Amino acid sequence: MAKKSLIEREKKRQRLVRKYRVMREYLKKKEKQVFSLEEKSKIKSKLQSLPRNSAPTRLHRRCVLTGRSRGIYRDFGLCRHIIREKAHACLLPGITKSS
């Protein structure tokens, strides 16, 4: 089980990404459309003034149940350990052992 502080930090990042997504997309589109160097630098400074954690590249996938950050399957949102346990208990429909 991951530390609660790490899980909460990740949730905070997700909230920030959702909050600033529209603004970030707008500034990036505008930067591509503008040709003058001065305006580009102004837009770039506005983009850099946004919170660092509002960038989607700073997000990490975490297991929904345990908070583990590695070995996450996108389809389920679970780590490999939990998927194995749930599959053996027949709690994941459509999952069978390969051998």
Swiss-Prot record:
Gene Ontology molecular function terms on file: rRNA binding; structural constituent of ribosome
UniProt xrefs under Pfam families: Ribosomal_S14 (PF00253)
Subunit details: Part of the 30S ribosomal subunit.
Protein encoded by which gene: rps14
GO cellular component, one term: chloroplast
Domain of life: Eukaryota
UniProt KW keywords: Chloroplast, Plastid, Ribonucleoprotein, Ribosomal protein, RNA-binding, rRNA-binding
Similarity comment: Belongs to the universal ribosomal protein uS14 family.
Protein name in the entry: Small ribosomal subunit protein uS14c
HAMAP family associated with the record: Ribosomal_uS14_1
Gene3D superfamilies listed in its UniProt record: 1.10.287.1480
Main function: Binds 16S rRNA, required for the assembly of 30S particles.
PANTHER family in alphabetical order: 30S RIBOSOMAL PROTEIN S14, SMALL RIBOSOMAL SUBUNIT PROTEIN US14M
InterPro entries: Ribosomal_uS14, Ribosomal_uS14_bac/plastid, Ribosomal_uS14_CS
